[in-house]
Structures are given as C-alpha cells and as structure tokens.
Amino acid sequence: LFDVLTELRSRGVLWAINTGRELLHIEEGLREFNFPIDPDFVLTAEREVFHRGPGGQWQDFGDWNQRCYKAHDELYLRSGSLLHDILAFLDRDTKAHPIFEGDRIIGLAAENDAEMDRICEFLERERVRVPGFQYMRNTVYARFCHEDFSKGTALSELGRLTGISPEHIFAAGDHYNDLPMLDGRHARWVACPGNSVEAVKEMVTRTGGHVASHECSEGVVEALRHFGALSQGEIAA
C-alpha cells in the first residue's frame, strides 16, 4: 500500500486518513508504522477535519470542527434523560463499561460482539427520543454523537474545502463506523477489504462498489486497481 500511495501522490492525488481515533493517536500511529509519506488530511474521532498548518502541525480545516463541537455541546444539553437511561441499562442489563470524558458519558465498551449487538438494539430504540442523537460502533465500542457529524459528512466537508466532488473521491472502510462514508453520497468510488464486517460488504455492494477478495491493505490496493486508478488516474482523491 505504501508504494501505491507514493505512486498516486506523484500523480497529484491527495489522501486522507478517516478514522475513529483521536488526533494524538494518529500521530503515534504514523510514527509507529513509519509511514513513508504523511497524509494530506486527517479526519479524526469519526467527525473532525484537520490539515497541515504553515508550521507543519495539524490544525482545524475551516470552521467545521468548531461547528461540530458546538452541535455536540447542544446535543448533550438535550440528552440528559436519555443518557441517564443508557447508564441505567448498562448497569442493570449488561457487563459493558461506560466511557466518560470528564463528567460526560461519551460512549461505552461492551464485553463482546453479542453484547454489543444487544446494546445497539437498545440504542436504536431509545435514541429517537432526542432528535439528532446517534452513535458510531467500532467492534465492541460505541461513541455517542450528533447524526450530522460522521465519517461521511466529514469527508464531504473535506471535498467541499478542497473543491473535489464526490465523483472524484475514493473511500474504503471495513467496520460499522465506516458505513456513513460508503453509502455513495460522499464518495463515488467505494470499497472494502475482504475482512470487513457483513454490514459493510452489503453497503458497498448496494452502492455499486468493490468488495475485495484480499484483506486489509491488500484489499484496498485491489479495489484501486479494480477501478483503474493505478493505471489510468481515474480517481483524483
């Protein structure tokens, strides 16, 4: 994958990491895996958008992040009763652990996938009580969020800021929190590696994308080759 990214970069292609991880963990990961080239952008916490500033540090790209923080503060002000009931459910009916940021519950960690499935069923039923309340699942973790801010909408905002339309954006993902960016609205070219969860494979198939036979990064390279990006330069970002 590194060789492919280097080749695409030489042809003017921009690339971004779109992840549920926080910005600090992105920097740690880039150092740990010794990436030969830095991403042009990082989209973090499933909703934030950053680019390199003049001094080389990651900084907010536009006002998206500030709008995101404001929307989440307002959401939490309206969600007290719902969050109280979520905590009660976790304590009463599960072995899951709530995750706090200060005194605010921002998500949870379940014991296993089966328990997480059951918790998600509960969240789906209850979240309708608060307009805009959503959650993002990744393995046995869930993060509470505003439905207007996801990997998908963050990717669309990046496209708007860079002047790149969805017709020229490729996106690949493998887990539940990738679903919002793989529905065909934010990227015309979508794919997933062979080790993706079934929900992602189904989404990619419905949107006319490519479900790779190879796993992990090899699956991403397979998808880029499938779409002709490695030989014809059809994908601009």
Q: At which residue positions do the language-model features occur?
A:
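Mg2+-dependent phosphoryl-transfer enzymes with acidic/Ser/Thr/Gly-rich catalytic loops
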Residues: C145, G152-A237
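A structural signal for isolated positions on well-ordered beta-strands in alpha/beta enzyme cores
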Residues: L14-A16, G107, F170, A191
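Conserved acidic, metal-coordinating active-site core of Asp-based
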Residues: L83-F170, Y176-G184
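A generic structural signal for alpha->beta connector loops
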Residues: G12, P39, V130-G132, A187, ...
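Short, charged/polar "capping" segments at the starts of alpha-helices
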Residues: I26, E115-D117, E198-K201
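Residues at the C-termini of beta-strands that transition into short coil/loop
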Residues: L43-E46, G53, T139, G194, ...
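Active-site phosphate-binding/coordination module
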Residues: L1-D91
